[in-house]
Amino acid sequence: MQATIKRYPTSPISGQTLGTSGLRKRASEVENTPNYLENFVNAMFNAASNLQKPGKIIIGGDGRYLNLKALDIIIRVALSRGFTDIVVGKSGFMSTPAESATIIRRKAEAGFIMTASHNPAGKEHGDFGLKLNMSNGGPAPIEVTSKIEESARNIKEIVIAELNKPLNIDSVGDIEIECEGKKAVVHVIDPLEDYIAYLHECFDFENLKQFVSKYHLKVQVDGFNAVTGIYNKKVFCELLGLPESSLKNAIPMPDFGGKHPDPNLTYAAELVHAVIPEDSPYDIGFAFDGDGDRNLIVGRGAFVSPSDSLAILSTKYNDIPFFVKNGFKGVARSMPTSAAVDHVTSITETPTGWKFFGNLMDSGKISLCGEESFGTGCCGIREKDGIWAALCWVSILAAESERAQRLVGVKEILESHWAKYGRNYYQRYDFDEVDKKAAEDMMQMMRDNAKTVKCDLNGVPLKFCDDFEYHDSVDGSVTSKQGIRFVFEDGSRIIFRLSGTGSVGATIRVYFDKYSKDYKADQTKVLADMVTVAYAVSQITKFTGREKPSVVT
């Protein structure tokens, strides 16, 4: 195959900004704006420190609409910049955690991940996303993404290779390309290969398979018709021995079958209604988001919140082979995540965004980390990992059942944890697609009033109100304006944040976190006073016109 380098002038395209984890835009905007992807990909190569000299790069994605077009452009821009060692997942597939593992195992300089994560997909109403990962396997830090944004704002020229025939990436193998005298190879790989090898280092699959067989474990796994479908069959059916009937929505589709791939109680209702009832035939259920880095865990009679999952994993790490082999060095959580894990062990508190865990993991300070937004992961890779979290829970069930010599369920483990450590009642309100200026004005009003605001929580006085600022203990960097916190004398917290993962308008997230030793109370009643206070101090209805949230988690 032959390639010729072309250069042509361009102009900046407004709105090419990076949120919590990369670019997120409506697919229709990306598709209908001339040079949208060519501009942005060139900006990435112009600005990112790990793309300034040719090295090995990995490209993959969650299978959503426009991914194949983006993949083609990334390859051709890479060729034009002298990159000769390009690795892509077959048919463009590679989950985010799998790509992190592949970057690490193949010692790549960078990874391009085509995903809008838990956002819907499709031509008309779906989103497209693209993010850059570094050589450690983790998301690009703020100093890199800021330079990419600056490059996109000032771009004047597109540099790209033109191929003499289309690339075929639907078969594993090497594609040799000669680009103006330089030979390059596009390696099309099995997107499962490196990730499954990594999972074998983390878990004892023979033991888990015996456990599944011994107790006839009934499991349901929802892949939302996204990329984890290709991984779920291998992991849950081949390695654990579960029947294929355990898998739901397991065939990846460009529009995810019209599903919203956010693994929470609202969008994973099919799984929730099948597994949570007390008379359910299922022992445990899992759902994973579009790119496979988020997880929902439910059991018969039980929903395991991400915050509780992190806390329980922190107490049961000896049941997880990865930690037995590598040691357990510490835990980090994002600031809005409930303080459940704080009652178990000392923690490091970071802003929202998996990239903030990277320095802590690279420096050996932590082994486990998690976010309230259904993300859990370990230092084995540098992304959160839905399937890894699910296998941790299967490992815990296996260990507890072995000790009890009977099948121990999710609900029993959850309630046993609460009985020992107490319970953090927790809820999140999402106000989606609100006017961006109104949302920003609301946040600024609370910042301005932080030192003078007066409120109490059913008689419990406010301890302080601030705008969370993170000081990285590894590199000394400071990240400000990460969420308005109302912290009360009993430790209860109300938190306001603007999300960085939406594609239209702004999303306001409001978090409620209250600790109690009584773990059997009604959550809605426990948090009712907090909701009233939140509406009052934020004036959210006045600013947004919304009386109710779009989603409650």
UniProtKB/Swiss-Prot annotation:
Entries under InterPro entries matching the protein: A-D-PHexomutase_a/b/a-I, A-D-PHexomutase_a/b/a-I/II/III, A-D-PHexomutase_a/b/a-II, A-D-PHexomutase_a/b/a-III, A-D-PHexomutase_C_sf, A-D-PHexomutase_CS, Alpha-D-phosphohexomutase_SF, PGM
Originating organism: Entamoeba histolytica (strain ATCC 30459 / HM-1:IMSS / ABRM)
The encoding gene: PGM
Keyword DNA-binding: no
Gene Ontology MF: a single term: phosphoglucomutase activity
Function, in words: Catalyzes the reversible conversion of glucose 1-phosphate into glucose 6-phosphate. This enzyme participates in both the breakdown and synthesis of glucose.
Amino acids binding Mg(2+): S117, D289, D291, D293
Protein name, entry field: Phosphoglucomutase
Residues that hold substrate according to the record: T20, R24, S117, H118, K131, D293, R294, T352, E371, E372, S373, K384, R509
GO terms, biological process: carbohydrate metabolic process
A GO cellular-component term linked to this record: cytosol
Biased composition (Polar residues): 11-20
Stated family: Belongs to the phosphohexose mutase family.
Active site: S117 (phosphoserine intermediate)
Location of the region described as Disordered in the Swiss-Prot/TrEMBL record: 1-25
Catalysed transformations (reactions): alpha-D-glucose 1-phosphate = alpha-D-glucose 6-phosphate
Cofactor or coenzyme needed: Mg(2+)
Subcellular location: Cytoplasm
